[in-house]
């Protein structure tokens, strides 16, 4: 029977462990210039971040922006026009955001604003987050009602 497999007999497979190359340690392989060539910026340290070869860097070409903007606090509404409502509800009735989501007119979890483009002839009871003044006038003129949530 051959020698039993023992922990102290285990050796790595040939060629699996390569010796680490120690650059810049003596005149032998990768010594002196350590594979960087001679002189110049790249031979010394790294090229500075943002350096563009002498042309004016992007960070200095663009003006400094000052001040404060309320843009990130702006409410962005999903828009539904009256002509869309008249197509979705030809017989009139109750119009809620949940109904509009179910019919695929709007997405859920975003506020809805009804705008006055188009005409509506049947009375509808619309509840939404916001209405334009023309949409309110046209819905009320058709005999419907408007509820802001």
Curated annotation (Swiss-Prot):
The keyword RNA-binding applies. GO terms for cellular component: cytosolic large ribosomal subunit. The keyword Ribosomal protein applies. Disulfide bonds: none annotated. InterPro entries: Ribosomal_uL15 (IPR030878), Ribosomal_uL15/eL18 (IPR021131), Ribosomal_uL15/eL18_sf (IPR036227), Ribosomal_uL15_bac-type (IPR005749), Ribosomal_uL15_CS (IPR001196). Keywords: Ribonucleoprotein, Ribosomal protein, RNA-binding, rRNA-binding. GO terms for biological process: translation. GO terms for molecular function: rRNA binding; structural constituent of ribosome. Residues 1-52 are annotated as: Disordered. HAMAP family: Ribosomal_uL15 (MF_01341). Belongs to the universal ribosomal protein uL15 family. Binds to the 23S rRNA. Part of the 50S ribosomal subunit. This is Large ribosomal subunit protein uL15. It comes from Thermobifida fusca (strain YX).
